[in-house]
Each structure stands twice: as structure tokens, then as C-alpha cells.
Design a protein with these regions (language model features):
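Alpha-helical transmembrane segments and their immediate juxtamembrane cytosolic regions
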Residues: 1-269
């Protein structure tokens, strides 16, 4: 009996893992945030391919990634099945990659090394493999899910190993390690509003200050500075009660790439 009491007291004194969050204090209106992310991403990609003479479209597009990154962090907090959540993103990445590569003009000569008329299977395989020369943002989002989940579930060795691999392979991620770090910061700050505002604000300003091309009051900064404009949407609870179809949310990415490609073929040729 005494042994049991000692075990109970020992368990009571154990320290809970501080990164296993089960709730979010920041904006939980992720359907609205995803919609804004979709629209700004569409504007960004349309500006890059269809309207390069309108640079403000690329500025508007800077809001998309922080919103998606935040939604990934919130998804990791609330998902009951992290593996299923990750699998959906990976499957979407596998399906979308060739469409993305063609639409956003990330093609390479190896994609067209074989004739579809003469060697259709080999040509299709070469086309698909070559499209991965510049992976889409979905690969970064999938890596973010792995990093957050391994940290949340206290799999420290796996977390550190994944972080090291991501650091080594950062050239294959949109936004490099900066984007992966942002997803981690969103997760770590998601349950503490007073910490989120200064930490995320400082990080976004620091990130934007790394580039050039813009200036204000004599201070030079890059286009990524405009991504900080997404933070108020994340910090303020909007309560729109909007519900977005999961199918629509996932299908939008390859669909918008296909539309941009079709328009570029019709309008620019």
C-alpha cells in the first residue's frame, strides 16, 4: 500500500510536456484564413505569370504563406490523426507537382527528354521526375507538419533528425528554413497570445529586413516584409462562422495552377 502511495505521489510530481498543446488562443477561424490565403495566392501567381507588369500583385501575395503556415500549426493542434493529416498533404503534393511546375514555369529540359508519341511511358516518367526540380509549397507544409507533430508528441530524436534534414535540404523548400521556422513559431505561440504578438512580429520584421528592393524612411527591406500584414488576421478573432469544404480546400491548389497555365497559353501565345 505504501509502495502504491509513493508511485502516486511520484506521478503527481511529474512535469507535463510543455509543447503538447490542445487548444489555440489566437484566431481559430481557419476557414476564413484559408479563403484569404487562397485568394492572395491566386493573385500572387497570376501576377507572376500573367501580369508581371503589376508588382503590387506579388506584394499582396506575400500574405498567403503566413496564413497557410498558421493554419498548418492550428491543424496540428487539433487533428486527432496526424498521420492522416500529413498523408493528405503529401498526396496533394504528389498530384499537384507537375501542374505547378508547368503553370509557374519551373520546367527543366529533362522533362521533355523523350517524345510522348514515341515513348509515352518513359516520357511521362521523365516529365514527372523533372517537375520536382522546384518543389511546390506543399512540400514545405508537409515538412512543417512533421516538425510540429514530432515536437508535440515528444519524439525529440525524430524532431532533431527531421530538423537537420530540412536544414540540409532547405533549397528544396519554398522560403527555405525561414518558412519552416515560421510554422514552428506559430505552433509554439498559438496557445499564448501575449507571447505570439512580440515574437512573431519581431520574426516577420527580421525576415523581411533580410531582402532589398523596397525602402521606407531610409530603411531598406525586401518584399517579404509585407508578409507581416497577415499577422493582424491571425491575432484577431474574427468569428465568421464560415465552413469550408475540405475537398474544395485541397482541390483549389492544383485547380488554380491549371487555370493559370490555361490562361497563359491562351493570352500570352
Amino acid at each position: 500500500m505504501k509502495q502504491v502511495d509513493r508511485n502516486v505521489r511520484s506521478n503527481d510530481l511529474s512535469i507535463a510536456w510543455p509543447f503538447a498543446f490542445t487548444s489555440v488562443q489566437l484566431n481559430r477561424d481557419t476557414s476564413l484564413l484559408k479563403l484569404i490565403a487562397m485568394v492572395t495566392m491566386l493573385i500572387d501567381h497570376a501576377g507572376k505569370i500573367l501580369f508581371p507588369q503589376l508588382p503590387f500583385m506579388r506584394v499582396v501575395g506575400r500574405l498567403a504563406f503566413p496564413l497557410y503556415a498558421y493554419c498548418i500549426a492550428v491543424g496540428c493542434v487539433y487533428t486527432r490523426n496526424p498521420l492522416k493529416y500529413l498523408s493528405r498533404i503529401v498526396l496533394l503534393a504528389l498530384i499537384s507537382q507537375p501542374i505547378y511546375a508547368v503553370a509557374l514555369r519551373h520546367t527543366v529540359p529533362s522533362m521533355y527528354a523523350y517524345s510522348f508519341a514515341e515513348q509515352p511511358l518513359r516520357a511521362a516518367w521523365a516529365f514527372y521526375l523533372g517537375s520536382w526540380n522546384h518543389p511546390s509549397i506543399l512540400v514545405s507544409l508537409a515538412a512543417g507538419v512533421v516538425l510540429i507533430t514530432t515536437l508535440k508528441e515528444k519524439r525529440i530524436s525524430l524532431f532533431l533528425g527531421t530538423a537537420l534534414l530540412c536544414w540540409i535540404a532547405q533549397r528544396y523548400f519554398d522560403y527555405g528554413w525561414h518558412g519552416l521556422a515560421l510554422m514552428l513559431l506559430f505552433y509554439l505561440c498559438s496557445n499564448t497570445r501575449w507571447l505570439a504578438i512580440p515574437v512573431l512580429g519581431a520574426y516577420m520584421i527580421w525576415w523581411g529586413a533580410q531582402g532589398t528592393g523596397y525602402s521606407l524612411f531610409g530603411l531598406k527591406f525586401g518584399i517579404q516584409m509585407f508578409a507581416a500584414l497577415a499577422l493582424p488576421l491571425i491575432f484577431i478573432n474574427t468569428h465568421s462562422k464560415m465552413r469550408m469544404s475540405q475537398i474544395f480546400a485541397y482541390a483549389f491548389y492544383p485547380a488554380h495552377c491549371a487555370v493559370i497555365w490555361a490562361l497563359s497559353e491562351f493570352l500570352l501565345k
